[in-house]
Amino acid sequence: MTMPVNGAHKDADLWSSHDKMLAQPLKDSDVEVYNIIKKESNRQRVGLELFASENFASQAVLEALGSCLNNKYSEGYPGQRYYGGTEFIDELETLCQKRALQAYKLDPQCWGVNVQPYSGSPANFAVYTALVEPHGRIMGLDLPDGGHLTHGFMTGKKKISATSIFFESMPYKVNPDTGYINYDQLEENARLFHPKLIIAGTSCYSRNLDYARLRKIADENGAYLMADMAHISGLVAAGVVPSPFEHCHVVTTTTHKTLRGCRAGMIFYRKGVQSVDPKTGKEILYNLESLINSAVFPGLQGGPHNHAIAGVAVALKQAMTLEFKVYQHQVVANCRALSEALTELGYKIVTGGSDNHLILVDLRSKGTDGGRAEKVLEACSIACNKNTCPGDRSALRPSGLRLGTPALTSRGLLEKDFQKVAHFIHRGIELTLQIQSDTGVRATLKEFKERLAGDKYQGAVQALREKVESFASLFPLPGLPDF
């Protein structure tokens, strides 16, 4: 028997094979990819994940992410699609929007939300596109001082971020002695620069932001205030840190960090009455909704990732539970325990501690840097990232390590466990200093890595790695059973 396909006849066995291919599980369909995923799953299970920007999504979130929603294309917004067959997609997106407002206790008459951004960076760029004309002026925390690449980073010789390419950016800074944001200098510079938008957001800053002060500065300059709460969105939802919504015009976030969802983004914007005309008494309404929605689609994106929106909706439901609130309090408690333990071991913590989920360890007093420490810790199954510290002269040799507690807290680690984690880190940095003394302080990072991989230090690396992996394996890894 044969079947006609595009004018040709295909053997029935081929179609049978085709149908079998569509029904095969990954482990049978693509062994190479399956094995890579299994290796990564094992790395996460036996290692200590200390990236401040990472977390372990729940099984429910990952199931939604891997659902049939991946198949559906749906350009547009609920009730205004360019494709048919979207009644359930509309239902899903509307539910996600409703939950987003509920999770942050927002009045739907005063706030709206776009849940279509593919991630945090597109969400930020959509806001800039909507509210700041090309070559308009933006102020954000400088990347070496704890800001984010999308907040306008540029060097003296090159515009690095698209934000700095298409808009004019002036960074604000932290005080190099204290590590705290210098709000006085920000206020003074804003009066000279006259930004259209000020960004209240960080990627490596361990203290709460003064949103009231930032709003005052924004108002003095006729600027919008946008919070990028990507790192702290879960903490905000749980009421563990101050909320940006009281003072900001717009709030953006990713959904996979402390919120513990899948990788996506959201943009919250004010609605309703903005002010009242003093002469006419007429209400002036915000127009942010139409500007932001049109910037996301059709301005910068095509069809939304409906499977990701489903994952975000699930995460938002979880974020409204008592269990989630307890988890977020534990994230902060664990971070303080880690900070205190490292301080007792002789390490300098930038700003002297933390109000949130991360700390920045300044290694200059130890005589080493973040790049070398990062490589040694990675070899010992401790995952974290190098980061610039206030006062660093070069981003190519950052002095610090950024450490975060959300992921390991999701695995069930408590304060006493993070004290052990601190000692593992300490042993790794001591090993870093041994290798560095052997190679010399002027050795390149490449030369350092070669010495690290040599026979002389592999015994010490293996011994520490085995202890780390034995400890990490005591705690369950959230997610799908097979991965």
UniProtKB/Swiss-Prot annotation:
- Pathway entry: One-carbon metabolism; tetrahydrofolate interconversion
EC no. given is 2.1.2.1
One Gene Ontology term of the biological-process aspect is: tetrahydrofolate metabolic process
Modification type N6-(pyridoxal phosphate)lysine: residues: K257
Q: This protein's superkingdom? A: Eukaryota
Q: Name one Pfam family in it.
A: SHMT
- GO MF annotations for this entry? glycine hydroxymethyltransferase activity; pyridoxal phosphate binding
Keyword Calcium in annotation: no
Q: Where in the cell is it found?
A: Cytoplasm
Give the cofactors, semicolon-separated: pyridoxal 5'-phosphate
The entry's cellular-component GO terms read: cytosol; mitochondrion; nucleus
Main localisation: cytoplasm
What UniProt keywords apply to this chain's record, in alphabetical order?
Cytoplasm, One-carbon metabolism, Pyridoxal phosphate, Transferase
Question: Can you state which reaction this protein catalyses?
Answer: (6R)-5,10-methylene-5,6,7,8-tetrahydrofolate + glycine + H2O = (6S)-5,6,7,8-tetrahydrofolate + L-serine
Q: How does it assemble?
A: Homotetramer. Identified in complex with ABRAXAS2 and the other subunits of the BRISC complex, at least composed of ABRAXAS2, BRCC3/BRCC36, BABAM2 and BABAM1/NBA1.
Q: What does this protein do?
A: Interconversion of serine and glycine.
Family, according to the entry, reads as follows:
Belongs to the SHMT family.
Fill in the misc note: In eukaryotes there are two forms of the enzymes: a cytosolic one and a mitochondrial one.
Name the UniProt record assigns to this protein: Serine hydroxymethyltransferase, cytosolic
What is the source species?
Pongo abelii
What high-level taxonomic lineage is stated for the organism? Eukaryota, Metazoa, Chordata, Craniata, Vertebrata
Gene this protein is translated from: SHMT1
